[in-house]
Amino acid sequence: MSRGIIIIGSGFAARQLVKNIRKQDAHVPLTLIAADSMDEYNKPDLSHVISQSQRADDLTRQLAGEFAEQFNLRLFPHTWVADIDADAHVVKSQDKQWQYDKLVLATGATAFVPPITGRELMLTLNSQQEYRACETQLRDAQRVMIVGGGLIGSELAMDFCRAGKTVTLMDNAASLLASLMPPEVSSRLQHHLTDMGVHLLLKSQLQKLEKTEAGIRATLVSQRNIEVDAVIAATGLRPETALARRAGVAVNRGVCVDSYLQTSHPDIYAIGDCAEINGQVLPFLQPIQLSAMYLAKNLLGGNAPLKLPAMLVKVKTPELPLHLAGETQRRDLSWQITAESDGMIAKGMSGEGQLRAFVVSEDRMKEAFALLKTLSV
């Protein structure tokens, strides 16, 4: 008798995988185990909750029970997996255990909080659960500091500013989105945020946070003090690999998987933000959607390697949205930038004259798909 497939996690990757499995097999036993409620919500919406006056519960799209009924699943919400015995094919919680034929780790990633004095005063917005824990404080806060000027930090800075709050956005780097693109490309967004009233503190580092009667005092390494009501850490995500380590599978930055999404153990797979696919961590929606399609086939007896095409990454800053694709972080590209009132096109060219990356903004985003077809990968 089939023991079926167990998926640990309940986020976007887990749900996409369930839907793809059920398209092909209505009966294989499917069990999902997760530490949260397993209710569905759209994680990218967290970048806009403040300006849209949304409460955490407003984000819920489908209750866990409805999901289980729709896709014929066994669900175990609010359940912490304590251990995995890979040889025995057993998953263990504190008071239960489950046997499996195939196991999928969809454990996601956790927000990195800088190890400074007062780090416990920092808030994170990496899940509906985290937002629920701090939504009152964030709604009431008038002065907000966001630490980290990457994708999420830039999105949050614009959102809080649109909600009428005083926003300070801080990063160690000399420009926003520094790990994604050079300063001459990100400067359009940087100038727009400044024009909106966001205070940018670049080439700056936080030293400590202290609770005060009026709120929180943030002290920079430069010894400058800034008084705020809330501090949000947007300093990146760390793939959740603890369970994989316990199972004895190979781990690097994420859970190491090959083109079949298979770990170093033949019956354990990983998908989503926790996975490192052939050395790459790809915490974006499109690679996860494609991964779910291929992994579903392979779990059901197929043998199809994942092939990822050139894909768009969207920066959800509504007043100046951006799409980017290719190797935008490469330092050896020559950038050709056309900036006009209706938007920007920035093309990253190799020494051989090949288009290796591009960034488009505003009305020029409609040209993204045509550029995608000419991208050298």
Curated annotation (Swiss-Prot):
It holds the Pfam family Pyr_redox_2. The keyword Ligase does not apply. It is an enzyme of class 1 (oxidoreductase). SUPFAM superfamilies: FAD/NAD(P)-binding domain. It catalyses: 2 reduced [nitric oxide reductase rubredoxin domain] + NAD(+) + H(+) = 2 oxidized [nitric oxide reductase rubredoxin domain] + NADH. GO terms for molecular function: oxidoreductase activity, acting on iron-sulfur proteins as donors, NAD or NADP as acceptor. GO terms for cellular component: cytoplasm. Gene3D superfamilies: 3.30.390.120, FAD/NAD(P)-binding domain. Keywords: Cytoplasm, FAD, Flavoprotein, NAD, Oxidoreductase. InterPro entries: FAD-bd_OxRdtase, FAD/NAD-bd_sf, FAD/NAD-binding_dom, NO_rdtase_NorW, Rbx-bd. Disulfide bonds: none annotated. Pathway: Nitrogen metabolism; nitric oxide reduction. One of at least two accessory proteins for anaerobic nitric oxide (NO) reductase. Reduces the rubredoxin moiety of NO reductase. Belongs to the FAD-dependent oxidoreductase family. This is Nitric oxide reductase FlRd-NAD(+) reductase. It comes from Salmonella schwarzengrund (strain CVM19633).
